[in-house]
């Protein structure tokens, strides 16, 4: 299911951020922002704001 797939992508983006691979995380978060549910989009947006800081 697409929602579950986006949850997995959010987890993957967090893992990339922890490893310092912000470029990979940004790419995944962009996809979640395009295809995720409202709740997933909020989570992706919050993670993206952490990348910017």
Task: Show the residue positions of the predicted features.
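Intrinsically disordered, low-complexity acidic segments enriched in Asp/Glu and Pro
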Residues: 1-27, 35-43, 49-53
């Amino acid at each position: 299911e697409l929602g579950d797939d986006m949850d997995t992508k959010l987890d993957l983006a967090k893992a990339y951020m922890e490893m310092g691979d912000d470029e990979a995380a940004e790419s995944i978060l962009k996809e979640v922002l395009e295809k995720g549910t409202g709740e997933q989009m909020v989570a992706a947006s919050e993670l993206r704001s952490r990348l910017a800081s």
